[in-house]
Amino acid sequence: MDKINIRNFAIIAHIDHGKSTLADRLIEECNGLEKREMKDQVLDSMDIERERGITIKAQTVRLMYTAKDGKVYYLNLMDTPGHVDFSYEVSRSLAACEGSLLVVDSTQGVEAQTLANVYKAIDSNHEIIPVLNKIDLASSDPDKVKSQIEEIIGIDASESLLVSAKSGIGIKDVLEAIVSRLPAPSGNFDNPLKAILVDTWYDTYLGIVILLRVVDGVIKKGMKIVMMSSNAAYQVDNIGIFTPHKKIVDQLSVGEIGFITASIKELSDCKIGDTITEEQRRCDNPMPGFRTIHPVVFCSIFPNEAGDFERLREALKKLQLNDASFTFDIEVSSALGYGFRCGFLGMLHLEVIQERLEREFNLDLTATAPGVVYQIISKNGILREVHNPHDFGDVQDIASIKEPWICATIMVPDQYLGVVMSLCNNKRGEKVDLSYSGNTALLKYRLPLSEVVFDFYDRIKSISKGYASLDWEMDGYMDSEIAKLTILINSEPVDALACIVHKSKVEQRGREICLRLKDLIPRQQYKIAIQAAVGSKIIARETISPYRKDVTAKLYGGDVTRRMKLLEKQKKGKKRLRAIGNVNVPHNAFIQALKIID
């Protein structure tokens, strides 16, 4: 295939601006699927993507398009996620392409994630074509959005394409712009094979499947290939492309995107961003690869049935292959048994992984409250990274604690600016910058990550009636006043209920948790004391009263000492029961007790 006729492009946008719908129309226009096979969000293969109306995994498809000049072009389309938690998927997709369609909702205008994604495309040296979607709606304002693109993003929007992905208006113009305005891939067919590993997933029959982009040379069936980071060698069994159906081909050459299978069983051999080359004729230098992504939110996941531990381990391994951005390690809890401490890119990422575990692997799970990574510096100068309250250590040995901060970009209509700034200030935020484009404010704030990851996104959407948008990136660590809050039930610490809290909120948090546990734990035959403590200091307490049996009911008249004797006997029995009895805490109590209330 002549690389001059290949175009590799990604579709990038803020969440809900119509990326997946535009992808559907492009596939339809190029006859990628027959009419009877077409459905909404055709590239969103997971049920959870369809139900939530979001893209989670970047997807690829090859289309054939006969342009007005009579030439046949091969278009490799990458549909990318729009939510901030999945921005890593966007970065990987952009590395495989030369150009991007920047889709902007012409009724909403530029939003925070639009900015973040377009800057990633600019960093990847992409040619960018602005596409203004939803022009058939009465509230559409293309001229205003064009000026926003030029003012806020700084790219020329005079040749923006006006489309309605839902009704199909302007789709041919998009295809013509792709072939005329986006560059063909560079690279040399005669050079040794050099391909970048873009994604991996697990297939029950084929083992590990690799999605790759060929940069130089050619990859053929039967060829011996090498993963340059691990030096692992495999023989290629199958080569294919997505149309969007899987289609087996003989080879992939310069500029092409497709998948290979090679009976790979070792997960560690397939690192996202690795360079693949031919064993007999290796390329000189590997590709720079992708930036290593680190989880920022951690929580523990436990199977409700002890016998499901191994099934959970296998499920996590398979999901990690398809999503290298989340991590897991074994954890043992005295309250919940054996489970895993898992790391995620954000709260939506956590919810999606937990939901996939329960749906795809039929597991019944309990997840503890999420937390972030703190840096603890001991008095002898040793730095430890801690995301689990159990690893906090002795307070006496700690010199200082640092917590992660982020830089948030918030775009909000000016009538909601006051309430949004008030929320940021309540979350210990520091204002960095405020600018305007028309009646839209562009707000930059520095905030502690622990205040943002839980419900900040939902709160921003709620107080702005859905009009505000948020994007954020890590901005280093800062010294902070942090304390470990321990919850005791009948003087016994419960590890699953421990959490790390800022000292300004520790008393309020302790009282909240104790009050919730009082409602959640069923009454027993003896008194239950629920306490919140920081170190050895008790800062909050609630008591669950026992059931009371009237042991004196059978008495009538007689000596008062008989009555006292029976009550004393009951008291001794309850004391003995409390000493040997375990308080049964329901599974859902752990999550409900740790939920944040403002």
Curated annotation (Swiss-Prot):
Pfam families: EFG_C, EFG_III, GTP_EFTU, GTP_EFTU_D2, LepA_C. Belongs to the TRAFAC class translation factor GTPase superfamily. Classic translation factor GTPase family. LepA subfamily. It catalyses: GTP + H2O = GDP + phosphate + H(+). NCBIfam families: lepA, small_GTP. One of its GO terms (molecular function) is guanosine tetraphosphate binding. Signal peptide: none annotated. Its EC number is 3.6.5.n1. It is an enzyme of class 3 (hydrolase). Keywords: Cell inner membrane, Cell membrane, GTP-binding, Hydrolase, Membrane, Nucleotide-binding, Protein biosynthesis. One of its GO terms (cellular component) is plasma membrane. This is Elongation factor 4. The gene is lepA. Residues 4-186 form the tr-type G domain. It is a peripheral membrane protein. Required for accurate and efficient protein synthesis under certain stress conditions. May act as a fidelity factor of the translation reaction, by catalyzing a one-codon backward translocation of tRNAs on improperly translocated ribosomes. Back-translocation proceeds from a post-translocation (POST) complex to a pre-translocation (PRE) complex, thus giving elongation factor G a second chance to translocate the tRNAs correctly. Binds to ribosomes in a GTP-dependent manner. The keyword Cell membrane applies. SMART domains: EFG_C. One of its GO terms (biological process) is positive regulation of translation.
